Every structure is written in C-alpha cells, then in structure tokens.
A protein has these predicted regions:
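Intrinsically disordered cytoplasmic terminal tails of membrane proteins
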Residues: 2, 6, 208-214
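Short, hydrophobic transmembrane alpha-helix segments
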Residues: 40, 44-56
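N-terminal leader/transit sequences and adjacent low-complexity N-terminal tails
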Residues: 1-12, 21
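Selective recognition of hydrophobic, aromatic-rich stretches within alpha-helical transmembrane segments
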Residues: 7-8, 12, 51-81, 109-146, ...
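Interfacial aromatic "cap" segments that immediately flank transmembrane helices
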Residues: 15-45, 81-110, 124-175, 213-214
C-alpha cells in the first residue's frame, strides 16, 4: 500500500514513532539478511578503523562510512533494495562527509563539556546531518548541519526525535532480553527506524520533496 507523495505545500500526515517502527519492520520483512549483513559490515569496519592510530582512523573515515550506512538504511525504509556497494558511496563525496563528521562531533562534544543539556540539544539538532547529506550531497556539509537543525528544532520536532531515541532504546533492550540474539535484529531495525524518522520529518516539512512509501 502506497501513500500519496507529498505535493506542493500541503502538510504531510506524519507517521507516529510507533507507526515508523511498524513500517520499518514491514520494510525488513524479506530483507533481514541484507540489513543484518550491512549492519555487521558497518560494525566490523568501524571497529577496525577505530583501532587505527588512537582513533585517527575513525576521524578520517567515520563520516564516509556513516554516509553510506545511513543511505542503505534510508533505501530500506523506502522499500528499495540497496546494493552492498552503496555502503561505500560516502567515499565519492569524501570531503563533505569529513567536514560534517568533524563539525558534528565538535559541536556535540562542546555541548556536553559545557553542560549535559546543551549536549542533548546539540545531539538532537544534528541527528539528521548524515541523512540530509546522503540525500543532497552536492549541497555540502554546512547545508546538512543547518537543515538538520531546521528539521528538528526550528520545525518543533525535537520531542519526536527524543521520543524516537527512547523507543530505539526500548527496542535494543528488547533485543538483549531475547537471549542476546535479538540484538542482531534490533540493531538494523533501529537503524531503519531512525532513517524513517528522517523521511517523516522531511515529508512533513513545507520545503520537503516527494518520497513514495511502500
């Protein structure tokens, strides 16, 4: 079943976080192996580069990998089947991903150094950076940061984002309770859920573009 695409400036009937969870589960129904494989690939590569040069590897490549992983999760939420090569798309636009990774990390870290609350505010406001960037890489890192902030705080969606963080935590804890094996399903599910949140925020925005759902 498809929802009608967003047209003009008519407000989009944004899914609730629980509806996003349900849609994400449905989107993964026949693609669990792909989603789990991509998540394991991301985890292994991230762990390897994180051990290089006291974290220098993560600084250098973390942005490109986040770009590619988020793109695969967005595609899964949209009912598409991402190719494994999509995971490495971030290296085609390496500089913007590096800048976005550094700026996001520094801003959030400064927020937590000052006080916990500013750190949480920054983390919520910049939570959509790599989703924006993977959709519009040609517009660069600065645009991605500003657009992420606009979609979350400026548009008044901060509680929805925070709610998704809490729901994701519950899903992860549920995976742990399932003899630990459930984590292999919970982790990609959470990744698709957070990608879906981005799509819902974007579609609900008066300046967003069309996306069709399955």
């Amino acid at each position: 079943m498809r929802r009608a695409p967003y047209l003009g400036r008519k407000p989009y009937d944004m899914r609730s976080n629980f509806d996003i969870l349900s849609h994400s589960w449905d989107a993964l129904r026949s693609k669990w192996l792909l989603a789990i494989g991509l998540t394991l690939l991301h985890g292994v590569i991230s762990a390897v580069i994180g051990s290089v040069g006291m974290g220098i590897g993560n600084i250098a490549l973390g942005g490109a990998l986040a770009f590619g992983y988020n793109r695969t999760m967005v595609q899964l939420y949209r009912g598409q089947t991402p190719a494994v090569e999509t995971y490495f798309d971030g290296f085609r636009t390496y500089l913007p991903t590096l800048i976005a990774f550094l700026l996001t990390g520094v801003i959030v870290l400064m927020g937590f150094v000052l006080l916990i609350i500013p750190g949480i505010i920054a983390a919520i406001g910049l939570s959509q950076v790599f989703y924006v960037l993977q959709d519009q890489p040609e517009r660069g890192a600065e645009f991605a940061l500003k657009e992420s902030w606009r979609l979350t705080w400026t548009n008044g969606n901060m509680w929805k984002v925070f709610g998704m963080m809490l729901l994701s935590l519950l899903v992860f804890l549920g995976g742990l309770l399932a003899l630990g094996v459930g984590v292999f399903f919970a982790t990609p599910l959470i990744s698709v859920m957070t990608a879906g949140l981005y799509d819902e925020l974007r579609l609900n925005d008066a300046q967003g573009g069309p996306v069709e759902f399955v």
